[in-house]
Amino acid sequence: MIFTESTALENQKSDTPKLSLQYEQIATDTHTLRSLDWDRSRFDIEFGLRNGTTYNSFLIKGKKTALIDTSHLKFKNIWFEKLRQEINPTEIDYLIVSHTEPDHSGLIKYLIDLNPNIEIVASKVAIKFLEDQIHQPFKSRAVKSGEDLN
């Protein structure tokens, strides 16, 4: 299912960025929340993008509920609207942070505001970076490659 924030036509220039979301089940108890940024023209510096790009989050429900990554700040309104339709943010036990680039971590501060008890699971370096960026206390667990969460 696709949710959009912009009414701009695909070939029409607009001051409003063309943003949309897709929410899909990809496995039992696992869904993806895919943020589609149609206006992004570059990835890093060297890669041109003809059709924009996506920022992907994954919601996994089991004995505990984990969210892998958030999204870019520009998706804040529609991303949280859709997340709330699918789950109460206070029911998410873990936020697993794959890396701290803004397209994956841009909404972490706001998720912590909604769920102060969420545990951030990331590398030691990522946790330190988030502490320096967020400027508020949060629960965290530093993990290394190969470790299990549960």
Place the predicted regions along the sequence by residue.
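Cytosolic, low-complexity regulatory segments enriched in Ser/Pro/Gly with interspersed Lys/Arg
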Residues: 2-8
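Active-site metal-binding motif and surrounding structural segment of the metallo-beta-lactamase
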Residues: 63, 74-121
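Short glycine-/acidic-enriched loop or helix-start segments at secondary-structure transitions
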Residues: 42-43, 107-108, 132
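Conserved beta-strand hairpin/beta-sheet module of binuclear metal-dependent hydrolase folds
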Residues: 23-85
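Metallo-beta-lactamase
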Residues: 9, 14, 18, 24-28, ...
